[in-house]
């Protein structure tokens, strides 16, 4: 006898299929050392994958380019990994002007995937040892912070102004309470359910739910930022409010030598691929600013 599947079971199965597909998609942002190095090798580039220990966590980063040039460190958003920046890392224009670095933020990629670090300050302190090492080789350092990477870049500049000479903020999640929360994030907050979701999404959700508190704690640091800033965001950003966040940045960055705000018509939150050329252009401009 044929039985109808109860609606809640059907919806559960459908949800699981969707989540599995999302998980498969997200894994393209987390590639092994071998796969990452192969990507660059096929382009005739000699990249390096390295690890260091910070606060008991092994942190992975990639580097490529000439030590005699200035440096750019790319800090990704959520959910993601350093592999989201592969195209930028392989860009011939950027490599002509700088040695390029990209990091797996704590909780992502191969920096303890699934083990969340929701504190912006702790993430900043875990990245600082890499910047200290970069500073030994490079006189100038520009940091690119995309989405959730934006406030981490700001916190690093507040904690260690000697380690950053310029910042590019891409669709930065910096204004408390000005981010979108999606329905799918709610079940990921339930301990018994979170284990069925991709670890990358769970970490992103943990960060999201702590973000307002963390951004409020960051508020006193903004006035201490004294490096040039380039701010880029899409006018159709569906995650970070494009109407209020640029004004927040302008009001808080009161002591920077320069602040350029670029709003892109018809552009949504995700910038790294669709705005590749603009990011390259503005990173090169920032390098010239800080020379």
State each model region's role.
Residues 78-90:
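The serine-hydrolase catalytic nucleophile loop
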Residues 87, 227, 241-251, 276:
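Short alpha-helix in the alpha/beta-hydrolase fold that links the catalytic acid
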Residues 94-112:
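Conserved alpha/beta-hydrolase
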Residues 124-139:
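Conserved acidic catalytic loop of the alpha/beta-hydrolase fold
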Residues 151-154, 158, 167-194:
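Flexible "cap/lid" loop of the alpha/beta hydrolase fold
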Residues 225, 231-233, 237:
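Short beta-strand/loop motif that positions the catalytic acidic residue
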Residues 236-240, 269-270:
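Acidic catalytic loop of the alpha/beta-hydrolase fold
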Residues 267-276:
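Catalytic histidine-centered segment of alpha/beta-hydrolase-like enzymes
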């Amino acid at each position: 006898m044929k039985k109808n599947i109860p609606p809640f079971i059907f919806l559960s199965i459908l949800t699981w299929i969707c989540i599995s597909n999302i998980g498969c998609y997200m894994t393209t942002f987390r590639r092994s050392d071998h796969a990452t190095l192969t990507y660059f090798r096929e382009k005739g580039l000699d990249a390096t994958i390295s690890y260091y220990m910070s606060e008991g966590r092994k942190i992975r980063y990639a580097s490529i380019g000439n030590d005699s040039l200035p440096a750019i460190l790319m800090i990704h958003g959520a959910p993601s990994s350093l592999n989201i920046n592969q195209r930028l890392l392989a860009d011939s224009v950027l490599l002509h002007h700088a040695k390029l670095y990209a990091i797996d933020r704590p909780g992502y990629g191969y920096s303890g995937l699934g083990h969340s670090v929701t504190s912006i300050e702790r993430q900043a302190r875990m990245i600082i040892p890499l910047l200290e090492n970069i500073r030994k080789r490079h006189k100038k350092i520009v940091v690119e912070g995309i989405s959730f990477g934006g406030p981490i870049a700001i916190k690093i500049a507040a904690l260690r102004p000697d380690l950053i000479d310029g910042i590019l903020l891409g669709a930065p999640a910096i204004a408390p309470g000005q981010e979108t929360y999606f329905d799918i994030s709610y079940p990921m907050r339930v301990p018994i359910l979170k284990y069925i979701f991709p670890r990358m999404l769970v970490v992103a959700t943990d960060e999201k739910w702590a973000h307002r508190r963390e951004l409020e704690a960051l508020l006193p640091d903004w006035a201490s930022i004294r490096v040039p800033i380039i701010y880029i965001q899409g006018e159709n950003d569906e995650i970070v409010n494009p109407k209020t966040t640029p004004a927040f940045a302008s009001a808080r960055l009161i002591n920077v030598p320069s602040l350029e705000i670029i709003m892109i018509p018809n552009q949504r939150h995700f910038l790294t691929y669709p705005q590749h050329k603009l990011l390259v252009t503005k990173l090169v401009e920032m390098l010239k600013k800080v020379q």
